[in-house]
Regions:
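Active-site loop segments of alpha/beta catalytic cores
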Residues: 1-166
Length: 166
């Protein structure tokens, strides 16, 4: 795969989270091959993005050991996700991508809820850099006008506050 000119690898770790495995089982079952996969990417100058919507909080210290590049798709409304703890624990070592709920906020929420969610995510995750504002998972812009409106609202709020004017 890497010989084909890949620049970036995204691993969907949804079924590797503590929603299914204890941290000790995660270390036993996944750590070794994940570390090999990440190191292989880095030797080829390929960045590595690890997605995990929920169940990541008990694994944050292990994430620092794995040394992947981006932790993404985390959702603040799922499984006790703590944005401040994520930033404090892994935000110096890993780029962070996510922080806004896709379904309840972007697909079903009001513009006020979107604004509050964006400001909360940026306030908790952007300090010191290394943060990419994004939904916790995919959104479907063709679903209805609410989703489209809220997607553009997320971007507009980010543009208003991106230079530290929260």
């Amino acid at each position: 795969m890497l010989e084909g000119g890949v620049d970036h690898v995204i691993r969907r770790g949804w079924y590797e989270s503590t929603d299914f495995w204890s941290p000790s089982l995660y270390r036993e079952l996944f750590f070794g091959f994940l570390k090999d996969e990440i190191d292989t990417c880095h030797r080829a100058n390929v960045t590595y993005d690890y997605c995990m919507n929920s169940g990541a909080m008990p694994l944050l210290e292990i994430f620092n050991e794995l040394k992947f590049d981006i932790f993404s798709n985390f959702d603040p409304l799922l499984s006790n996700t703590d944005l401040v703890k994520i930033k404090k624990t892994v935000g110096r070592e890993l780029a962070l991508c996510g922080g806004v709920n896709n379904f309840l906020v972007l697909e079903k929420g009001t513009e006020e809820e979107v604004e509050a969610a964006v400001k909360d995510a940026v306030n908790k995750l952007a300090g010191g850099g290394g943060y990419i504002l994004a939904p916790g998972d995919s959104i479907y812009l063709s679903t209805d006008e609410t989703t489209r409106r809220n997607f553009y609202k997320m971007i507009a709020v980010w543009k208003e506050i991106r230079n530290g004017s929260i």
